[in-house]
Amino acid sequence: LIDMFQRLPGRRLWPRTKISSLVAMLALSMLGAVLPVVSATPAAAAAAVAGPAGDDFYTPPSPLPAGNPGDVIWYRKQADSGNASSYLVLYHSRDALGQPNAVSGTILVPKGRSPVGMPIVSLGSGTVGLGDQCAPSKNSLVSVAQNQGFIDKALQRGFAVAMTDYEGLGTPGVHTYVIGRSEGHAVLDVVRAAQRLPETGLSTANPVGLLGYSQGGGAAAWAGELQPTYAPELNLKAISAGGIPADLLAVSQQLDGGLGFAVLAMAALGLDSAYPELDLESYLNASGKKFFTDFSDDCVESLTIYPFRKLSDYTTINPLTTAAWKARINEQKLGAVAPKVPTFMYHAWPIDELVARPQGVALKDTYCAAGSPIRWKDYLGDHATVIFTSQSDAVSFLADRFANVPFSRSC
């Protein structure tokens, strides 16, 4: 597997030790807040505007033009990805506070197949980092490593794939990492963008599945909870979500002082970006100000140099212990809206070193108690290896639901 990553086409050769560390840190997603949202009225597909060349594509017009969530601001036709047409899109979405924003993403449509009735899989990427250069649409090494298997398996089955970059990855601003409402909106709105880009031939009639692991698993789960009120017009059929960080407080206890400290630091920056009143900088000591400044544009492969540190190393007061931070964190706990569509949930077993297993099981139990159609599976391995060992099952689960194969609940 490491050899395969080293030899990805068109990429420089990475040292084996670097790749090993990278894979060990592929991580996380956590939160969001389920708040009532007024859904946008679906718009008919209109002629799309071609976006600017280069990285200027990712900078939206200022002021942001009016638009409903999922409306395409502009797009770019890219080189085909295998046997799929590829489009880069900048689209309207909503942030954690419900305010309009612009998010980038990628849409892949298999060639040689009718788009009529073609399933659309919205893939939430796992953790890639905070820097704009890490965005999934820019094909960073870590994004390709963890997402390409999902993409290939979906395309081989004839499914279109829509993958968001999330808020603040590629686009201006700090990535709102781990903020479930922001990520859930982005995951749903990239499907709308795929349906509204005339070049794809897709529409609201196409069945939709949500897919992701780690940060992507959390994003998919949040999209599932938000969909009934935020995007009710989507023909949602199923969800496959693994390694879900459903309870940030529970996850943070394992990360602070542990192998995944960098992920906790990313979460702190994500919360601060989504909720400016939290004012992370006011809690930082001199070391913390330097650390978070240097850290804020890293990709995940460079984050492996920060294990076993603690927030107390960088703060005068640990913000996670304050009332303001606790209130926002408590808003982020998954489980308030149980999914009504078949949902495949899975986790590393017996121990997940990055996303604590007990809180994932607790979310499953919450959904099951509410009567949700859940299928649960344990995968022997750690957080990183389960990314790869689970991919076939996760995509197959969606395929079976698209094909109306009978579903058996396994709570």
What are these regions (language model features)?
Residues 95-156:
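Short, surface-exposed "cap/lid" segments of acyl-processing enzymes
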Residues 349-358, 384:
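Acidic catalytic loop of the alpha/beta-hydrolase fold
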Residues 43-114:
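Catalytic-loop region of hydrolases
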Residues 2-45:
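Secretory targeting and sorting signals
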Residues 242-336:
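Accessory cap/linker subdomain of secreted extracellular hydrolases
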Residues 339, 344-348, 352:
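Short beta-strand/loop motif that positions the catalytic acidic residue
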Residues 150, 177-199:
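Alpha/beta-hydrolase active-site loop
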Residues 192-262:
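Primarily recognizes the serine-hydrolase "nucleophile elbow" in alpha/beta-hydrolase
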